[in-house]
Amino acid sequence: MEYNKKIVTDLTDLKGKKVILRCDFNVPINKTSGEITDYTRIDAALQTINYLLDKGVKLIVLSHLSRVKTLEDISSGKKSLKVVHKALKNRLLGKTVLFEENNRNKDLPKIIDGMEEGSLLLLENTRYADVNEKGEVVKLESKNDPSLGKFWASLADIFVNDAFGTSHRAHASNVGIAKNIKESAIGFLVNKELAKLSKAVVNPRKPVVAIFGGAKVSDKVPSIKNIGKFADKILIGGGMAFIFLKAKGFEIGKSLYEDDQLELTKELLSEFGNKIVLPVDAVVADSIKAAKGKRYDMEQFPADLAGFDVGKKTIKLFKKELKLAETVIWNGPLGVFENDAFNKGTLKVCKYIAKITAKKGCYSVIGGGDSAAAAAKCGVTHSFSHISTGGGASLEFFSGVELPGVACIKNKGEEGKVEAVKEKTTTTTESASKEKSSTAKTASKPATSKTTAAKKPAEKKPAAKKPAAKK
């Protein structure tokens, strides 16, 4: 799939413009300390952020953080972007980095008008809009509520999507904004992701070897079908391997599998059977939490145990298939990666892919998630050609479907237009203004700032200060 989307460098006359930027700051946070444990996603967004700030825009940044399902999720502060605000301030020294606790504050237009050129305003977690003041799950963000997308779009002149990790979702903070704004573009990160992933699937260097792992085959079927069209080999591991083995008549003991996917799995074997390579042995145990497992050939698989990793014979077989590969696409671990007793297959295959990438120039792509975590654990992250920042997004990309968060962006040369959106009786901002700040910890009126806000002249009256976000 080829892309001709506007990128941030195609935008002109940016000085003084208001730009709303969707980032993916869904970072891991230590539950005890409340500190961020991996800054990769924040650092990945800095190129676009710095580019826009250096152009003199007023930058409004949106992101989600985890899922928000209850008022407790909001009031506890555990899913607040305040910790991200702190990280951004530390990385954007010398630049004004503000934070607004209410991402639907009716005074946001005034706050943004009062911002200095080249400053940034981070709005609170977009998914706070998924729960209303009564604690009801309304999913205004996650289900792309028209009024919410229109409100956020009204805050800016231009929309930039640089959140690849959420581009497979049609949310109010990406598709909803893009439909209601005249000019839009993708950021450096999304552009890089599209280019790197495309290289693996559009006229890739042959032979192509794809590796699929993880627990559920249902998550991978569309990608297997699409990649199966051009891949030379498809290596199957992880929990999903057992449904393939069962479909071929092997004993899999108490290994979990999706019974409703059995017929579909048989169809995959029928269509791509000459390409699919399955485990020939497995490491089994009586529990996923077992301290150690025992290896069995598939022909001798015990009926009273379950498989949690590929065995040494399978690792050797997979390495043999990978040896001649010029392109490798990997999505999903080959075992229960979280347990050291069952991570050998994932780690050894990971190191081998890194080795052939470094030694013979194989083009290797990891589709994020646990596979990326495996590369980090092995210390070979920089040995891969590309490690995606979006597990779900990369998987959908591999299925051949255009991502909603990319499809909504204007193409190069396309004239700006705004799609008509039917108004609701109660607007999103009106709803937000009714929320109790004591429960949701959002500002029902503009937050105060330690910095002086710009003054708006008024006829025959003293100048009134504009609302300002917290610094």
Curated annotation (Swiss-Prot):
UniProt region (Disordered), positions on chain: 417-471
Reaction catalysis annotation: (2R)-3-phosphoglycerate + ATP = (2R)-3-phospho-glyceroyl phosphate + ADP
Enzyme category, top tier: transferase
GO terms under biological process: gluconeogenesis; glycolytic process
Sequence positions that bind ATP: K220, G307, E338, G368, G369, D370, S371
Bias (Low complexity): 439-455
UniProt EC number: 2.7.2.3
SUPFAM superfamilies: Phosphoglycerate kinase
Similarity remark: Belongs to the phosphoglycerate kinase family.
Subunit record text: Monomer.
Official protein name in the record: Phosphoglycerate kinase
